[in-house]
């Protein structure tokens, strides 16, 4: 199983719990979701607990993260969208921290589980729908009828827009899940190839040099992808929240 590149994504129970025939086991995925929240919360707490005019490195990173998301939200959803800052910031930090933790050996990448990313995506779309109807009532349906569309084409356009809207949780979740899954599998394959070549002795060492270089390069790339995927998730969230804030206007 050690050579199986997909073994790292296997959800395994740590504390088996079954109630009424339903499995509520505390798994490795559960553990690392808790660890992700703890790591992100701990970082922000220690980074801001001793704030000063001359910021420490941790404080600078925390402040840059704050400004980064605030600027993204203002551009994506306008000033009125700033009401969602805690929501978007929390999502960004969770996804980013989960992605980064998954880069360490023997750590579990929770964002490589489609059920986790789909739950996050449904949370985003659910927030858009609830706030949209709360803010605009039935006028929220205006997002499915873009202005300037001829009346003859309105039913077709509205149908397409509605299908596009309902597919957002799928596209948002699959994008994050697929990128993290593919990246980690590729790293595992290259690392396994290096180990296999090295086991051949002196003859294999020479052949392992190129795969080793590729593994190091791809590891650096995966750290970049970890940030980019969190960024894309946050950007798309801001764009979707724009519909809730401004409705069909």
From Swiss-Prot:
It is a multi-pass membrane protein. Keywords: ATP synthesis, Cell inner membrane, Cell membrane, CF(0), Hydrogen ion transport, Ion transport, Membrane, Transmembrane, Transmembrane helix, Transport. Pfam families: ATP-synt_A. InterPro entries: ATP_synth_F0_asu, ATP_synth_F0_asu_AS, ATP_synth_F0_asu_bact/mt, F0_ATP_A_sf. Its main location: membrane. CDD domains: ATP-synt_Fo_a_6 (cd00310). Belongs to the ATPase A chain family. This is ATP synthase subunit a. It comes from Agrobacterium fabrum (strain C58 / ATCC 33970) (Agrobacterium tumefaciens (strain C58)). The gene is atpB.
């Amino acid at each position: 199983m050690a050579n199986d590149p997909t073994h790292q994504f296997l959800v395994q129970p740590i504390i088996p719990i079954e109630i009424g025939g339903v499995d509520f086991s505390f798994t490795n995925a559960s553990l690392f979701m808790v660890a992700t929240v703890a790591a992100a919360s701990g970082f922000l707490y220690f980074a801001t607990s001793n704030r000063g005019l001359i910021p420490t490195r941790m404080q600078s990173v925390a402040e840059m993260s704050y400004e980064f998301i605030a600027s993204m939200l203002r551009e994506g959803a306008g000033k009125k969208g700033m009401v969602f800052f805690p929501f978007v910031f929390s999502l960004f930090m969770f996804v980013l921290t989960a992605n980064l933790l998954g880069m360490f050996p023997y750590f579990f990448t929770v964002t490589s589980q489609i059920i986790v990313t789909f739950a996050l995506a449904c949370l985003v779309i659910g927030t858009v729908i609830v706030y949209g109807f709360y803010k605009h009532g039935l006028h929220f349906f205006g997002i499915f009828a873009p202005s300037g569309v001829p009346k003859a084409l309105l039913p077709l356009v509205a149908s397409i827009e509605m299908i596009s809207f309902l597919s957002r949780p799928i596209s948002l979740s699959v994008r994050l899940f697929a990128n993290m899954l593919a990246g980690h599998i590729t790293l595992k394959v290259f690392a396994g190839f290096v180990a296999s070549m090295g086991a051949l002795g002196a003859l294999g060492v020479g052949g392992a040099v190129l795969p080793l270089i590729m593994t190091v390069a791809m590891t650096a790339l995966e750290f970049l992808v970890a940030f980019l995927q969190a960024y894309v998730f946050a950007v798309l969230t801001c764009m979707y929240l724009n519909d809730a804030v401004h409705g069909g206007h």
